[in-house]
From Swiss-Prot:
This is Dual-action ribosomal maturation protein DarP. It comes from Vibrio parahaemolyticus serotype O3:K6 (strain RIMD 2210633). It is found in: Cytoplasm. It comes from the Bacteria. The gene is darP. GO terms for cellular component: cytosol. GO terms for molecular function: ribosome binding; rRNA binding. The lineage of its organism: Bacteria, Pseudomonadati, Pseudomonadota, Gammaproteobacteria, Vibrionales.
Length: 175
């Protein structure tokens, strides 16, 4: 005799997650807002985003539309966004937003490294060589000595700036 509505003990339990209608609406509104932010970006920037072709076309259309047509197109973009994975799109958008602050942080890091090269000498240069093996050790040592002399004599920091330019060029090559 067959059992009805019973699972065998070896079958895994399926957990059903109930989502309220309000929560679904909030999620859809978030996707639509993400779509609005994408519409505000330049086409050259959008090329770097992981978007489907339909979504790319909808965004391009929304950028051309005005007022009511734009509002309807944004709703369509929100609908298309439901079929996309929003996490990589959000990550790419965050990267675009924080591009300036990331560049500033990288420059501060290079400035601190330059200060260490001038103050600590060979020990800091060894650290630079670990980070950037293609760096010219001899030139860095020479510039570090010159920068220390310039600082002591109160002269303009020509070598100090040149060390920074070398580190900046090495950092850009690595990227």
């Amino acid at each position: 005799m067959a059992r009805k509505n019973q699972k065998a003990p070896w079958e895994p339990e399926e957990e059903i997650i109930w989502v309220s209608k309000s929560e679904m609406k909030r999620d859809m509104e978030e996707l639509q807002k993400l779509g609005e932010e994408l519409v505000g970006l330049k086409p050259a920037v959008l090329e770097k985003f992981p978007l489907s072709e339909d979504l790319r076309e909808a965004i391009a259309d929304a950028q051309r539309f005005k007022n009511e047509a734009r509002r309807r197109q944004l709703q369509r973009i929100g609908k298309l966004m439901r079929y996309e994975d929003p996490e990589p799109i959000q990550a790419a958008l965050d990267k675009v937003r924080n591009k300036h602050s990331q560049a500033t942080a990288a420059l501060h890091k290079l400035e601190m490294l330059r200060d260490r090269v001038v103050e600590e000498g060979d020990k800091a240069i060894d650290d630079v060589m670990e980070l950037y093996p293609e760096a010219d050790r001899q030139r860095l040592r020479q510039l570090a000595r010159q920068a220390a002399k310039e600082k002591k004599a109160g002269k303009p920091a020509k070598s100090y700036r040149e060390i920074f330019q070398i580190l900046k060029a090495l950092n850009e090559e690595e990227i």
